[in-house]
Regions:
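Extracellular loop and loop/strand-boundary signature of outer-membrane beta-barrel proteins
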Residues: 14-18, 47-49, 97-101, 128-130, ...
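Repeated loop/turn-to-beta-strand initiation elements of outer-membrane beta-barrel proteins
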Residues: 1, 38-42, 70-75, 121-125, ...
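Transmembrane beta-strands of outer-membrane beta-barrel pores
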Residues: 1-7, 36-38, 47-51, 77-83, ...
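Surface-exposed beta-loop-beta
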Residues: 1-60
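Outer-membrane beta-barrel "beta-signal"
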Residues: 113-117, 146, 153, 157-158, ...
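Flexible internal linker/loop segments at domain or repeat junctions
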Residues: 76-112
Length: 185
C-alpha cells in the first residue's frame, strides 16, 4: 500500500502545502481474542515494513471484565515503535503527524483504562484515562451518557491533562469538555 507522511518543516509550492513523503508499506498483522479465567482478552500485532523509513510495529494487549453489579472495566497496553521513548525526542513533525492522524501516538508506550457503570436504565457514568509510560503524563476523562430513546443519546465528558511541559498530555494544553448528541439509524 502507499503510505505518506508529511514533512511539516518544508513547504512545497508544487503541492501547495507541506511536502508529502510517500513510500510503499507492507503490513503483516495478527490478532486474537478470547476468554481467560472469565476475563475477555485480546492481542493485536502489526509489523510495518517501510520502503525508505525505519520499519516499526504496533502491539495492543488488553483485557476486560463486567462485574455482577454491572460495572465494566477495561485495561489495554499499546506499544508503537513509531512513537518516541521520551518527550525530549518529540519534534514538530511528530506533533503535527499526531494531530493530522498520520501516526496514532506520540509516545511509544501507553496504558488505557476505562470503567463504566449504569446509574439508571438510561444514564451511565464512566471514567477513562490514558497514561503515557514514555513521558509520564496522563489524561483523565470522566463521562456521563444519557440514552433517552432507543437510538438517541447525549454524552458529556471532560478531560484533564496532567503532565510536564512538552509531554503528550501536558497540563499546558489545558483541560476541556464536550457534549455530543448521537442519533443512530
Amino acid at each position: 500500500t502507499r503510505w505518506a507522511f508529511t514533512d511539516y518543516t518544508q513547504f512545497s509550492p508544487e503541492h501547495q502545502g507541506f511536502s508529502p513523503l510517500p513510500e510503499k508499506r507492507q503490513v503483516l498483522g495478527v490478532a486474537t481474542s478470547g476468554e481467560l479465567l472469565g476475563l475477555g482478552v485480546w492481542a493485536e500485532y502489526a509489523w510495518n515494513s517501510m520502503e525508505r523509513t525505519e520499519d516499526f510495529y504496533g502491539l495492543v494487549v488488553g483485557s476486560n471484565y463486567t462485574f455482577d453489579f454491572q460495572t465494566y472495566v477495561m485495561l489495554e497496553y499499546y506499544r508503537n515503535t513509531l512513537g518516541k521513548t521520551d518527550s525530549d525526542e518529540y519534534t514538530l513533525n511528530d506533533w503535527m503527524r499526531f494531530i493530522a492522524s498520520e501516526q496514532k501516538a506520540l509516545s511509544r508506550d501507553q496504558v488505557y483504562f476505562l470503567a463504566q457503570h449504569p446509574l439508571t436504565d438510561f444514564i451511565e457514568a464512566g471514567i477513562s484515562s490514558i497514561y503515557s509510560i514514555s513521558d509520564n503524563s496522563v489524561v483523565i476523562a470522566p463521562t456521563l451518557e444519557y440514552s433517552f430513546a432507543q437510538n438517541m443519546q447525549i454524552t458529556a465528558y471532560l478531560n484533564f491533562n496532567i503532565g510536564e511541559e512538552g509531554s503528550v498530555y501536558s497540563d499546558m494544553q489545558g483541560n476541556g469538555g464536550l457534549i455530543r448528541a448521537r442519533v443512530y439509524f
